[in-house]
């Protein structure tokens, strides 16, 4: 999710982003991530006045589990934010279990969302 620990614009991983916006501000970004390993992910970003206010991310990772095939890990993250980036509420679920939100995970989401917003904003003009 949100380019987690991947160089998302490199040969390791890349994303396709679709933006929806009335003039002048972007209100929604849909990002589909493709990894060079068995994994699937998508992120949804909702903006108000150029600030991220809601984020939904889902990622399905596949890991080799000895000789028994692949083990799956499903991670879902939902964030509700103030316009200054403070978290109002969150839900992080890993394989059906509630999990805590690390500061590093939050920083990755916020920095990636800001970077995407700038990239897409530059392209819309």
Where are these regions (language model features)?
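Mature extracytoplasmic domains of secretory-pathway proteins
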Residues: 21-23, 35-65
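Generic alpha-helical secondary structure signal
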Residues: 10, 18, 24-25, 49-51, ...
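Short hydrophobic/aromatic-rich beta-strand segments that constitute the beta-sheet cores
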Residues: 27-31, 52-58, 87-92
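Short, surface-exposed coil-to-beta transition loops
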Residues: 13-16, 28, 38-43, 57, ...
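Long terminal segments
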Residues: 1-11, 65-125
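N-terminal secretory signal peptides
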Residues: 1-36
């Amino acid at each position: 999710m949100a380019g987690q620990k991947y160089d998302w614009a490199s040969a390791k991983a890349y994303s396709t982003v679709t933006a929806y916006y009335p003039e002048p501000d972007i209100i929604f970004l849909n990002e589909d991530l493709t990894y060079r390993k068995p994994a699937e992910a998508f992120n949804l970003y909702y903006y108000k006045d150029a600030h991220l206010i809601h984020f939904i991310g889902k990622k399905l990772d596949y890991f080799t589990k000895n000789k028994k095939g692949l083990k799956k890990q499903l991670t879902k993250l939902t964030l509700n934010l103030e316009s200054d980036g403070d978290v109002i509420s969150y839900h992080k679920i890993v394989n059906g279990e509630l999990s805590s939100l690390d500061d590093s995970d939050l920083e990755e989401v916020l920095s990636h969302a800001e970077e995407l917003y700038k990239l897409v904003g530059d392209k819309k003009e």
